[in-house]
Amino acid sequence: MESADNGPLIGLLPHQWFNNASVAGKLGAAYDSVRGQIKLLAASQFKTQYRYQGFVPHWPGVKEGPRLDELADLLKADVRKRRELIPGRENNDNWRTSAYWQGKGLMRTTQLASVAEQQGDLEARDQLLGLAKERVEWWFSGQNRSYFHYDKGLGTLSGFPDEFFAVEQINDHHFHYGYWIRAAAEIALRDPAWAAKDKWGGMVDMLVADIATTRRGGSDFPFLRNFDPYEGHSWANGLGGVGEYGELGNNQESSSEAINAWAGLILWGEVSGNRELRDLGVYLYTTEIEAINHYWFDVHGQVFAPEYKHVEASMLFGGKYSHNTWWTDEPRQIKGINLLPIGTFATHLGRDPKYVLRNLGTLKGDTELWLSRGKSYSEVPKDTWHDVFAKYLALADPAAALSQWDRYGSVELGETRTHTLHWMLSLNEMGTPDFGVTADTPLYQVFKRAGGRKTYLAFNASKAPVGVRFSDGQVLTAAPGMLTRTRP
């Protein structure tokens, strides 16, 4: 028998069919999968459309409040110890000298520089930016034991020394290089000449191209190395899944570090005048956030099987989801690896405040269960990543986060106490993110206090004033090369 050709059936994943008006009323049969229900669409193509929420490179200075002296004291202390912010360039054991740890150090250094700048300490800002430039140039020069190497045969840029099989298996490049791209963009905001293509910007462009070139069919780098357009998120293993886990397909653990990378593309594209790259970054950033909400956090309750009792998946494989990490089963790190780094680009984590509280609410029980199995905090502090969780809570309840935070608590190696306190004080002053308002510029954010008062932010990377219109009717003129705030 031969049937008529009625065209293909496309299987849509939850992030493709959920709230997708273009396929409403057109979906047919569905079947269960590890990603939730796959629904069939009789068509040769379909589209997804998500709302880009925006972010700004940094938040304005905090000028009022009871803890300004504490913020100033922490800033002085962190600046005084600035040489400790980035791990040493070289040591006999290669301890934390890889591109990953160096990148985390660079990003926290430039974040601290932004806080210093916004709080009015330009001398501290310049000291920190000078330190960041020094380390970037050390690696980019190719004249030292720490360097990047382009392998023409493999079509990849690798950092030496490496960790996490970043060279052997081409793992985690978007995680590692995202920190570098973001830090370089922060430097470029203040020193465009440093970031020129014939200076250090050319190397930044290579880092970008390695993880997400906009060119198809190139002989140097593959198009979108890490990102899977159909799955809507990135994969971290460069070989597509190997060893004992190979049958489960590829995997990704730290979805939040992927978001950091795509935010870096947006910012670098905007600062360098590369609109094509900026727009690609917007697509990657916005799409992966939707996938994270479905497959890592299951905020809509459509993915996790009933027997899966955790509130999040910390590791996503092609064929399973898992509540663990590659290096530990300690609950705080299991939860935190999909939160860090928390910067201005990460406010999407607070889109569902009830989920934030529910997520954090499971930490106590998870920890008690872990300890009951004979585990102990012999290798890490009991308050590991205390600052990460405080910043996450602040997206839902800034006052509670500020009251619970201990300035003497542990510090994650991509953070500083100054940046953490500035984050919480900012949210206490401005309110939580208002995701109902958009703007006609890529670098913007809106916050809303409980009483209804809003704060509008816009960053203008160009050399001329730009008029910005927000979807609720508010307008402002963004001054060139800086952050502009209005609070009607």
Where are the regions that the model predicts?
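Aromatic-rich carbohydrate-recognition surfaces in CAZymes
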Residues: 96-116, 128, 167-208, 254-262
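Active-site rim elements
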Residues: 247-252
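Active-site neighborhood of glycoside hydrolase catalytic domains
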Residues: 255-288
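Surface-exposed helix-capping loop/turn segments at secondary-structure junctions
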Residues: 192-194, 217, 275
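Charged, terminal alpha-helix-loop-beta segments
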Residues: 211
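Active/binding-pocket-proximal capping segment
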Residues: 200-207, 278, 282-289, 474
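Ser/Thr/Asn(+Pro)-rich, low-complexity disordered segments
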Residues: 1-167, 171-174, 214-241, 269-272, ...
